[in-house]
Amino acid sequence: MVSIRPDEISSILKQQIANYDKSVSVSNVGTVLQIGDGIARIYGLEKVMAGELVEFEDGTEGIALNLEDDNVGAVLMGEALGVQEGSTVKSTGKIASVPVGQAMLGRVVNPLGQPVDGNGDIATSDSRLIESLAPGIIKRKSVHEPMQTGITSIDAMIPIGRGQRELIIGDRQTGKTAIAIDTIINQKGQDVVCVYVAVGQKSASVAQVVEVLREKGALEYTIVVNASASEAAALQYLAPYTGAAIAEHFMYQGKATLVIYDDLTKQAQAYRQMSLLLRRPPGREAYPGDVFYCHSRLLERAAKLSESMGSGSMTALPIIETQAGDVSAYIPTNVISITDGQIFLSADLFNSGLRPAINVGISVSRVGGAAQTKAIKKIAGTLKLELAQFDELAAFSQFASDLDEATQKQLGRGKRLRELLKQAQFAPLNLAEQVAVVYAGVKGLIDEVPVEQVTQFAGELREYLKTSKPDYIKQVLTEKKLNEEIESVLKESINEVKSSMLAA
């Protein structure tokens, strides 16, 4: 028989009593009343905040959006196959946040900041709220530095500045994403952090974009946020805010950043889906009344900060897809009114072989010359006007049989300018190359070159300058302006290439 020692038992009991922690953990808990279509109706959760994260018992997270008298409407961020009627839900007391920092560069993440590229965890301790206030007027400075896209027609006629919001709008398959990707590739060596947000895209398309960025060496300064078409509507709605939060972190550190939202039409559709399922009253085109605010609070976060705030910037290039070129629909007009200009891509121009298919007539940059380098500003002043006049003349000349010499000359120059502005995809040009090409067209130096040979001429001119006149390229890239010496070198080079082409 085991002998029991009362003193040992009493000492154990005393020790346990001494170590007893009588703290009570209080958590705000509710019960799922109804679940379906990515929406949960929850009873309880009395102290929950609007926009607060809630956690279901299977670990799925949701966001409380509708706070009603007798229930809370929450959207689920994920499949939530384990959530059912009667499941418990607890409020977390937190608003959605996302990891940020240097370690994010080169990674592909979902809208919650979790890596989806199979390259392991992201080692960063910093985080930032997905929704945050845009900088106020005092914290901002007017846009004055160029954000070179590497696309001649944009940099010459519709210049974009650091801190600007420039909308890229057009029908499907007109090259909207191509312009955005070219702009990212052109930031190589410029110390600009790029964020590409893909909303509602096919996963294969996003994988293709990531591969192009990797090939061109652009992924090392780019972060990709992907909410593909198969993801929950809540994640598609959140993705642009996540992209903005990641870029803001770098902006407040004094860096220049570029964010591409591809595209906000899909985000608006996801928000409409969520709102209708939450039984919010529909408005025009069945969108909820606050869909304008959904986009304005996102795009207002783009800014050029003042010196006292570190002089960082966030440039936003939102993309909107139109139906049959209708820019007067609800979402396109909303975003046009929020942004500082738009680049309109036309399906007709695209199909006629003009790439990038920019309709110069209705494309505009409301920042304009303030964000242009002196070199391109000096020569591109008349370019937009000449092309707009050419479009009118071309339409008119279809009905005229005999045209006077001046009109024929103007039509000829317009055709050559059109050809000069054609550019291959993923092949952005530097400032010196753009200046050379535009100068040749605007000054009428290639009026004798046959129209079908203009593209070949532009390629040969760029090659000639790189090999024979490296000092010209270096000088334009450093000084960013044209002087008489540079102009004479340029004229000489253009005439040299032209004469060798015409002689062949």
Swiss-Prot record:
CDD domains: ATP-synt_F1_alpha_C, ATP-synt_F1_alpha_N, F1-ATPase_alpha_CD. It comes from Prochlorococcus marinus (strain MIT 9211). Belongs to the ATPase alpha/beta chains family. Produces ATP from ADP in the presence of a proton gradient across the membrane. The alpha chain is a regulatory subunit. Its main location: membrane. The keyword ATP-binding applies. F-type ATPases have 2 components, CF(1) - the catalytic core - and CF(0) - the membrane proton channel. CF(1) has five subunits: alpha(3), beta(3), gamma(1), delta(1), epsilon(1). CF(0) has four main subunits: a, b, b' and c. It is found in: Cellular thylakoid membrane. The record marks 363 as: Required for activity. It comes from the Bacteria. GO terms for molecular function: ADP binding; ATP binding; proton-transporting ATP synthase activity, rotational mechanism. It is a peripheral membrane protein. Its EC number is 7.1.2.2. InterPro entries: ATP_synth_asu-like_sf (IPR023366), ATP_synth_asu_C (IPR000793), ATP_synth_asu_C_sf (IPR038376), ATP_synth_F1_a_nt-bd_dom (IPR033732), ATP_synth_F1_asu (IPR005294), ATPase_a/bsu_AS (IPR020003), ATPase_F1/V1/A1_a/bsu_N (IPR004100), ATPase_F1/V1/A1_a/bsu_N_sf (IPR036121). ATP binds at residues 170-177. Keywords: ATP synthesis, ATP-binding, CF(1), Hydrogen ion transport, Ion transport, Membrane, Nucleotide-binding, Thylakoid, Translocase, Transport. This is ATP synthase subunit alpha. GO terms for cellular component: plasma membrane-derived thylakoid membrane; proton-transporting ATP synthase complex. PROSITE patterns: ATPASE_ALPHA_BETA (PS00152).
